[in-house]
Each structure stands twice: as structure tokens, then as C-alpha cells.
């Protein structure tokens, strides 16, 4: 389901709170006008957890400060490539900023979710992700966990199926 439809379709409007993090749906989600209309609903309680004041922050009831990439442990993949790497905390969070994981884990606890998963530290979560991936070799797991970026291989049978006459991405279609 697309976000705009989820927030505005009278038959589907069951969403009364929204937690937005590491995203700016007011300008990046498909059909932005519908998304913004949904974000303006009086009965929608919106929390935005961000490092910057984004367009989506304009629709928030609460804005929470997020940590920067040097203030928390994280695992990263690159856009348009198949590289995986880790970034480890260099400094303590500034002010009252919290990482995405800290906020999500705390919300889970306050909602009564008792799964041990929410007790993991960021580092433990990264290790679990890396160690349980069937596509990452033991050697590459250690490289990633030691902070080295690893270029993943694309499976031989991988094929993107674009619904265009050429079967490829077409930035301009003369039809």
C-alpha cells in the first residue's frame, strides 16, 4: 500500500499515529500531494525523528533529535552498488539525540513488547544481521564487522524485470 493512500483513503484510514525516521515522505514518497494531504489530518499524530529539519517535520506534532552517523553503531549498504559496511560510534550523542534503534527499542519496551530482540545493543544487532545472512561468507562477515566495506556479488540468476519495451530502465519513452 502506498503511504498517501494509506493516510487518505476513507476505507483504509486506520492509521492515527505515524513515526517517521530516516525518511522524508513529504517530498520523496510517490504522489506527494496526497501524502501531504494525509500528513495534514487533524486526527493523525506524527512524530519525526531526524537529524535535519525536513519538509516532513513541518507536519509533525513532535520532532525528536536523531544521532548522526558518528554517534551510533550502524550497518550500511550503498545506493546503486552492492557494498556493505559498518560505521562505529566515535562520539557520544550530542544533547538529547538518540539513534533510531534506541528510540525503536524504547518504544517497544514501553508498549509491553518483551521480545529479547529489543534488548540487543546496536553492535549486537549488527552482528546478528551479519552472522545470519546466508549471502555473506564467514570471511566477509569478519571484514564487515571489523569496519571494512565488502563488495557483494550479484547472484548469476539475478535479473531486473522492467516493464518497458527494452526491458531496461527508460528515462524517456517515445511512445
Segments predicted by a language model, with ranges:
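Long, low-complexity segments enriched in small/aliphatic residues
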Residues: 1, 123-175
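Non-catalytic alpha/beta scaffold blocks inside enzyme catalytic domains
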Residues: 1-136
Amino acid at each position: 500500500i502506498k503511504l498517501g493512500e494509506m493516510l487518505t483513503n476513507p476505507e483504509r484510514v486506520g492509521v492515527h499515529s505515524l513515526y517517521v525516521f530516516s525518511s522524508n515522505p513529504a517530498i520523496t514518497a510517490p504522489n506527494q500531494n496526497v501524502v501531504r494531504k494525509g500528513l495534514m489530518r487533524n486526527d493523525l499524530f506524527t512524530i519525526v525523528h531526524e537529524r535535519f529539519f525536513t519538509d516532513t517535520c513541518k507536519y509533525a506534532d513532535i520532532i525528536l533529535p536523531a544521532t548522526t552517523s558518528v554517534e551510533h553503531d550502524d550497518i550500511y549498504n550503498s545506493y546503486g552498488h552492492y557494498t556493505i559496511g559498518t560505521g562505529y560510534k566515535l562520539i557520544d550523542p550530542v544533547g538529547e539525540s538518540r539513534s533510531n534503534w534506541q528510540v525503536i527499542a524504547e518504544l517497544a519496551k514501553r508498549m509491553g513488547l518483551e521480545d529479547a530482540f529489543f534488548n540487543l545493543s546496536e553492535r549486537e544487532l549488527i552482528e546478528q544481521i551479519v552472522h545470519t545472512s546466508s549471502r555473506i561468507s564467514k570471511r566477509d562477515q569478519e571484514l564487515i564487522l571489523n569496519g571494512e566495506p565488502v563488495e557483494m556479488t550479484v547472484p548469476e540468476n539475478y535479473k531486473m524485470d522492467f516493464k518497458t519495451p527494452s526491458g531496461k530502465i527508460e528515462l524517456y519513452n517515445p511512445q
